Amino acid sequence: MQHTSRDHLSYNFKTTAPHPPVEWKISDGLVEYPEALRYMQKRVENIYAKIAHEQVWLLEHPSLYTAGTSANKNDLLIPHVFPVYEAGRGGEFTYHGPGQRIAYIMLDLKRRKQDIRAFISALEQWIIQTLAQFNIKGERREDRIGVWVVRPDRPSIISGIPAEDKIAAIGIRVRKWISFHGISINVDTDLTHYSGIVPCGITNHGVTSLLDLGLPITIHDVDNALKKAFEQIFGPTIDVS
């Protein structure tokens, strides 16, 4: 296991004072990306105005690509296969689509910890603890945000370094110390759809999913694992429709 400078950061992102539980919202079906973006932006405004609570929103999108603020246009290899959206989040190009669980995280970091680097580390830990419930060892990397799995079953791309694939991506934005956008975990995603981009600008490593790792796990199973791990790191939740 590789160690990173983020390993020492605290994974406790619970509120520093008593606070209502985080709303836990799950949407069935596919949510169009512009609709999700509008929802998040409005929610951030309302959290800042103290007329809405923090929320985690679990959903799936139809197949599409999003470009983060660091995206290189040359990394969009096949521009017309799926819609492409400017996301406004950090990061580069990524794919979203059916079979991928997205969790948009709208939290007030002023009530928790005003440290974006530590927040990203906590999000990574959330994913790592989620995957551990399925006996998958997820790892972070010093120079790559997200969560990775080592693939000893595959040939090395870089001599002397075991192959590894990305199973979960992180891309956030923080406005007035309120986070939005979030994480995505590949459950049974069609991995061929990543061929239209250079995912997150990384060429030396691939992508994987729970199904690709030999685990035919349902989205519902992943949701339960996400909730358990989230509450360990960020505090209690309450289900909302």
UniProtKB/Swiss-Prot annotation:
Active site: 200 (acyl-thioester intermediate)
InterPro entries linked: aa-tRNA-synth_II/BPL/LPL, BPL_LPL_catalytic, Octanoyltransferase, Octanoyltransferase_CS
SUPFAM superfamilies: Class II aaRS and biotin synthetases (SSF55681)
Organism: Bartonella bacilliformis (strain ATCC 35685 / KC583 / Herrer 020/F12,63)
Entries under NCBIfam families matching the protein: lipB, PRK14341.1, PRK14345.1
Annotated PANTHER family: LIPOYLTRANSFERASE 2, MITOCHONDRIAL-RELATED, OCTANOYLTRANSFERASE
Any GO BP: protein modification process
Extra facts: In the reaction, the free carboxyl group of octanoic acid is attached via an amide linkage to the epsilon-amino group of a specific lysine residue of lipoyl domains of lipoate-dependent enzymes.
Enzyme Commission code: 2.3.1.181
Annotated site, Lowers pKa of active site Cys, chain positions: 166
Cellular component per GO, a single term: cytoplasm
Domain BPL/LPL catalytic intervals: 50-238
Keywords from the UniProt entry: Acyltransferase, Cytoplasm, Transferase
Subcellular location: Cytoplasm
Disulphide bonds in the chain: none
Protein name: Octanoyltransferase
Chain's role: Catalyzes the transfer of endogenously produced octanoic acid from octanoyl-acyl-carrier-protein onto the lipoyl domains of lipoate-dependent enzymes. Lipoyl-ACP can also act as a substrate although octanoyl-ACP is likely to be the physiological substrate.
Residues engaged in binding substrate: 89-96, 169-171, 182-184
Class of enzymatic activity (EC top level): transferase
